[in-house]
């Protein structure tokens, strides 16, 4: 979408009427992806384009953009740029009445709703960057499945910008499957969902490394919609991905770099595992870890009698609790980061969880545990969620 220039320094003589709730929701959506602090003030604006077809609202910070279209009665078409978060705050608190927005003779943006009246500064439209367009290959994914898969995977991405490739979620399309993968070196989360590439479907793989923060907002925004269209476009330093559902579109600049080949870390199969009730295990972990010092691992001992959690902290504080578990194989004692385990248990989305103990050719190296969903004690879950967690060394 281009950025038309205003007719003069005071801006275009725009005037339109719009439903309060529809407008408030649209503004809230487009400003959600903007950073709280932006070094370029112009990027704090929301671009509103009023035409005979209605309103188009957009926000862009050179890395991510959000766009939506809504119905409105437009008396005088034109384009305005106004501070986004301030407009969102105002719109969410307006009385239950239609909104009128117009540009006054001094170039200010006047918003009227019932007896409430606001005059906001007009930002220079001509200085706003062009919103990126995406016209590459695309496919469809079920909205609910995609939102769930993001919630199951994105939390495992790193929050440390020192290694940018680990702050993203790798989207990989192969045939009729879309995989989402994230890792911070200490854990790996993976989920697969159906992908409909339409007539352009191919067995060749397509990969895109999307910032986890942006993808998380996409999941929240599109969690209750229908199918989501995902399109890949661009090349070199301007590779982007677009997510569209209904009248909303989000684009994101992709992270440059090679995502580590973590899929090969998942074991082909092993019978050494334990099945535990997910909620019971999570509650016990929360209780016992209360006495742990920060970053200390929680000790887990798996036997045929159940799984026992032991913790000790400062000032001689200790805690222990046992939960029923169905163990196949030898007894196991290991240390796990309780927060990382709890995040996995939240992501599993099943009544029971299967904890598989992998093995390594290196006897001196701790092998990760594999966490998957389990419908019952003896029946695996239906989804394709997998989570690898690296154990911690335990002090004797």
Protein language model features and the residues they cover:
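Structural preference for solvent-exposed beta-strand-turn elements
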Residues: 1-396
């Amino acid at each position: 979408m281009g950025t038309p220039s205003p007719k003069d320094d005071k801006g275009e003589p725009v005037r339109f009427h719009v439903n309060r709730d529809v407008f408030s929701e649209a503004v809230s959506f487009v400003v959600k992806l903007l950073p709280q602090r932006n070094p370029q003030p112009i990027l704090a604006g929301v671009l509103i384009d009023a035409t005979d077809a209605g309103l188009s609202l957009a926000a862009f910070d050179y890395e991510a953009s959000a766009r939506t279209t809504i119905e409105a009665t437009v008396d005088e078409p034109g384009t305005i740029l106004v501070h986004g978060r301030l407009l969102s705050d105002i719109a969410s608190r307006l009385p239950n009445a239609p909104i009128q927005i117009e540009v006054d003779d001094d170039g200010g943006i006047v918003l009227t709703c019932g007896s409430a009246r606001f005059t906001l500064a007009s930002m220079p439209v001509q200085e706003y960057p062009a919103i990126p367009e995406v016209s590459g290959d695309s496919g469809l994914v079920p909205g609910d499945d995609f939102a769930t898969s993001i919630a199951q995977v994105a939390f495992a991405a790193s929050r440390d910008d020192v290694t940018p490739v680990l702050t993203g979620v790798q989207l990989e399309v192969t045939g009729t499957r879309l995989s989402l993968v994230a890792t911070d070196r200490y854990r790996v989360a993976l989920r697969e969902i159906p992908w409909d590439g339409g007539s352009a479907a191919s067995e060749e793989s397509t990969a895109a490394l999307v910032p986890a923060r942006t993808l998380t907002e996409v999941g929240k925004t599109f969690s209750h919609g229908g199918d989501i269209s995902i399109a890949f476009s661009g090349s070199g330093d301007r590779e982007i991905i677009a997510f569209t559902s209904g009248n909303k579109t989000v684009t994101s600049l992709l992270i440059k770099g090679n995502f580590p080949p973590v899929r090969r870390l998942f074991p082909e199969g092993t019978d050494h595992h334990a099945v535990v009730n997910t909620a019971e295990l999570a509650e016990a972990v929360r209780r016992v870890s209360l006495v742990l010092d920060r970053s200390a691992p929680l000790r887990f001992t798996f036997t045929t009698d159940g799984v026992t959690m032991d913790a000790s902290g400062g000032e001689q504080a200790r805690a222990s609790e046992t939960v029923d578990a169905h163990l196949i194989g030898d007894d196991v004692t290991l240390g796990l980061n309780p927060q990382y385990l709890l995040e996995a248990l939240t992501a599993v989305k099943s009544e029971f969880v299967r904890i598989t103990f992998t093995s390594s050719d290196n006897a001196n190296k701790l092998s990760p545990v594999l966490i998957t969903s389990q419908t019952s004690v003896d029946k695996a879950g239906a989804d394709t969620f997998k989570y690898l967690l690296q154990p911690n060394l335990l002090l004797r």
